[in-house]
Amino acid sequence: MDIHKEKIIILDFGSQTTQLIARRVREMKVYSEIHPFSLPLEKLKELNPTGIILSGGPCSVYDDDAPHSDAGLFELGVPVFGICYGAQLMIQQLGGSVEKAEKREFGKAEIQILNDSDLFAGLDVARSHQVWMSHGDRVEVIPDQFEVSAESAHSPYAALRHRSKPFVAVQFHPEVVHSIIGTDLLRNFVFGLCKCQATWTMQGFIESNVAAIKEKVGDAHVICALSGGVDSSVVAAMIHKAIGSQLTCVYVNNGLMRIGESEGIIKFFKENTDLHLIDVDASDYFLGKLEGVTDPEVKRQHIGLGFIKIFEEEAHKIDGDVKFLAQGTLYPDVVESVSFRGAAPIKSHHNVGCLPDIMKLSLIEPLRELFKDEVRELGVELGLPDEAVHRQPFPGPGLSIRIMGEVTPERLDIVRRADVIVLDEMKKHGYYNKVWQSFAVLLPIQTVGVMGDFRTYEHVVALRVVDSRDAMTADWSRVPYDILGDISTRIINEVRGVNRVVYDISSKPPATIEWE
C-alpha cells in the first residue's frame, strides 16, 4: 500500500497555524505536506496532489509585495480550499475583489450556514456556529459562479463555494480548536471533495520505511545518534527492525544533560533492548566549545557540529563499512527551519541546517515526515516500552538552551538542581503525564531578596509548563497554585544562588516552548 499515493498539499502564506492544518489532515489518516506559497506550478504538478489547501497569512492580497501562488493551480483539476488569506487570494485570482474591512474581526465569531453542501454537508443549518476569525480585510465582490455558504455579523462572505468546480473558501480558521465545526469542514474537504482514502497509518509507515531503509543501506552500516529521547529511540527501533546488527547506536554525553540522565539512559537501553550501544563522554569538548558563547543560535550550531564530529570519529572505530548517520529530525523541525518565503528561520535546529558540507556520512532521517504525536504512536507500534515513548521532550542541545547567556559549570549546576525539583514535584503530584513539558530556565539576571536577616542578590529561575498535542502550538499549563508553590519553595530553599522563581504564562505562538 502506497501511504503517499493520496496527499493534501498545503501552500504556506505565513500563517502561525499552517502546521495545524497539516496535523488536522494527518489525524484523519490522510498524508499532508507543507510547501512555500512560491512552489513552482510544475513542482506542484509533480507532487500529484489529491487536494490543495491555501493557508492563512499576515499580509493583504492587494499589497504590492503580497505573496501570490501561481493561479495555474486552479487549472489542475483538483479541489482547492482557501483559508483566510488563502480564501481572499482565491477570490482575487478568480476575478473577485478584496478590500480593507471597515471593522476587523479577531477572535471568536458566530457564523450562520446558508448552504449545506460541500464543506458544510451534514451540519445543522438551523443554528449559528462558533469559529475563530483573524483578519483585517474582507471579500467585497465575489467572482462569477461563486455563491455564499456562510455569513457572520461583519463578513457577508464568511464562506464561499464555486457552483461547478471543487473550490471552497472560508474567512475563518477551521484548523484551530476555537472553530467548533472546523474539523468537520476539513473532513468534508478531505473525504467529500477530494475523495481521499484513509491510508496514512503507522503500520503502513513502518512497512514502507523498513523496505526503503533496507534498499538504501544495502550491506553498509549505520550509526545512530541516540539521546534517550522519544525521537532517537524510535529512530533506533525503526532502523534496527530494518537492518538489525548493521546498526550501531552512539550515545554522546555532551555535559549538558540533567542529573543522572546519562547513566539512566545507558542503563535503560542495555537492560531493555538488544541494540549495540556505545557511550561517549564528550563533556569537556562541548563545554569548551560553549565557553563565552551567549547567542542561542551559535550554541545550537556548535552543538550540532560537535555531534557530527564525534559521530564521524566513532564511525571510524566500527567494524564494517559505515556510510550513514541516522538522527531523529521531525517534520516541525524541517518546517520551522525555513520560513514561508524560503528564508529567515524561526530558529535553527541542531538536526537541521547545522550539518557541514564536508560531512562524510550520508543522512537517514526516517521520522522526517512525522509530527511528535505520530512518533509516539509509531513507537508504540514498534513495541517500545512506555517509559521510552511517553517521556517529556528534552532538547538536543540539552540544558544549554535553558541557560540564558553563557553556559558555565556554576550555572549548569543551578539549572540542573532546579530541574530535578520541577520534575520531582510534577510526578509527586500526578501532573507529569498531564502536561506536554515541564522544566526550569535560568535567567541572565539577578534580583534583590532577603534570606534571614541578610540582603541577597541572586539568580532568577523561570518555570515553564505547557500543554500541547504536537509542539506546533502550546498553551501555558494552569498548574494548581499549591504545586507551583511547592516547586518555588523547594528551589529557593534547596538551590544555592536562587532567590526568586517566576512562572512563564506565554503561549506558542508568539513564544516558543523553549526559551532559546
Swiss-Prot record:
Organism: Desulfotalea psychrophila (strain LSv54 / DSM 12343)
GO CC aspect terms: cytosol
Example of a GO MF term: GMP synthase activity
Record Pfam families: GATase, GMP_synt_C, tRNA_Me_trans
Presence of keyword Phosphoprotein: no
Highest taxon, organism lineage: Bacteria
Subunit field text: Homodimer.
Domain GMPS ATP-PPase: 200-391
Annotated active site: C84 (nucleophile), H173, E175
Gene3D superfamilies referenced in this protein's UniProt entry, alphabetically: 3.30.300.10, 3.40.50.880, HUPs
Chain residues that bind ATP: S227, G228, G229, V230, D231, S232, S233
Name of the protein in question: GMP synthase [glutamine-hydrolyzing]
